Structure formats: C-alpha cells, structure tokens
Amino acid sequence: MENIIKIENLYFQYPQGEDEEPKPAIKGVNLEIEEGSFTAIIGQNGSGKSTLAKNLNGLLLPSRGAVYVSGMDTRDDEKIWDIRQMAGMVFQNPDNQLVSAIVEDDVAFGPENIGIDPVEIRARVDEALDAVKMGKYKRKAPHLLSGGQKQRIAIAGVVAIRPRCIIFDEPTAMLDPRGRKDIMEIIEKLHREGITVILITHFMDEAVRADRVVIMNKGEILLDGTPEHVFSQDELIKSARLDVPMAAEIAIYLRENGIDVPQDVVTAERLKEFVCQYR
C-alpha cells in the first residue's frame, strides 16, 4: 500500500513572547502513514501529539520540515482544501465542530462547502448518519443530544465529505465509558471499511486496538511499532509517564515468573484467551 501521509523532519513552534526561550512543540519528527492503516499516537499532555495531529491536514503549518498528504504539501495554499477533503479531522470537544441548529444540516455543512450536488448531499447525509447509528436523530437539535451523540454527529459530518483518512484528536476524552465504547466501535468500523485512521489518545485500551502505536514524548517519537512490540517496552513507556495496558503488564509479570506468555497478549480479550488455554 502507498503512504497517504508523509512527514519529513517536522519542527513546529508556537509563537512566543520576546523574552521566552524558543521551545519547539515538535522536534525532528519523521513518520509515514500507510493508506488503510490504523495508527494510534499516544503521549502525556504536552508530548506534542495533538500539535502533530493538527499538522497532518494543514490546521497548523510546519516551522521547518514538511508534511505531505497524498503527495500534496500542506504549505501549498492552492492545495489546502483538497488536503482537508482527503484528511478529515474530529476534535475532542464536539461542540467546537457542530455549526447548525439541526443535525442533518450540520452533517450537510461539509459537502455543501465543497460544492456537492444537493441530491448527492442528501444521500451522503443519510448514509453518514446511518454509519454512526444516528439516523433517527436527523431532525433533532444537536444541543439536546448527549456528549457521545454529539461526537457521533461530528464524525458523521466528516464521513459525509468521504475522506480517505480521518484524524481523531482525543475523540473520547470527554465521554463516559459507554460513550467511549460506542465511539471506538465506530472508529474500528470505519477502518474496516477502508478509511485510514489516525487516533490521538491517552487511553491505552484504545491504543492497543490499532495496527501501529506511536508514542510521543517531549515533541519527539519515543517508540513506534506494533502494539505487541511497543507495549513490551514497559520501562521505556513508564519513563514517558505513561501506563502500560493492564493486560500487557500482567503478561510481562507472568513472563518474569517463568510462564511463556505470547508477545501478542496486550489486550484483555487476548489475555483471557491465553489463561483459558493455559495448562
């Protein structure tokens, strides 16, 4: 598969006062995202993960280096709307993404702004709302919905544009456990349907569902690999002030005590399977 996103020696620095010492939020990051993949990017607050996310579709532009989306440079003003149509983004707070008084109008907002035919917009809105199981709410006012329902509407608004990639910037951070579960099921469904998913999160149980995990620390990539590889590096992860998933921590403890636990035991489901099969 080809890369949909390519990051080359990316540095990003927020504007600072005259007396402040320059401190890049992103420092020399190189990363390639394969089309159709599911990548989780995790890190503590201040690690640079959300800043990186906003550089992926031109919401922020590199201070140095470059970001390419399907070969298009995010610094190219003439390509920026093509880039954002290809790489959509869902934010942590859905209230910041909802713009209309009626759900179906909100979902239609993106397609309308890229000049889609009205008949096609209607089909896309219905399809996107069905994809997030919110079809029966299309005539409701978004402000009357729960946080999880609002986030589903925000996702539907991005899906209606039909991007090849969706960047989720901590989409479950403001939700209760049930809401988190529902949103993760939608994200996994979109990935199965062929959309490239980039998930920014600080929840380890979400990160283990990805094909690939990237750990950010102090603006740099600390670890990059499969969940099995990354979450076996428990000391390095803890040095970045992150927790290892509980299942992975139990697996590490069992290995240290002489039990041959497979390296792919990083989720509760996989740990349960191993325990049931162990003799």
What does each model-found stretch correspond to?
Residues 119-137:
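Conserved ABC ATPase "signature" region
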Residues 42-44:
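The feature captures the beta-strand-to-loop junction immediately N-terminal to the Walker
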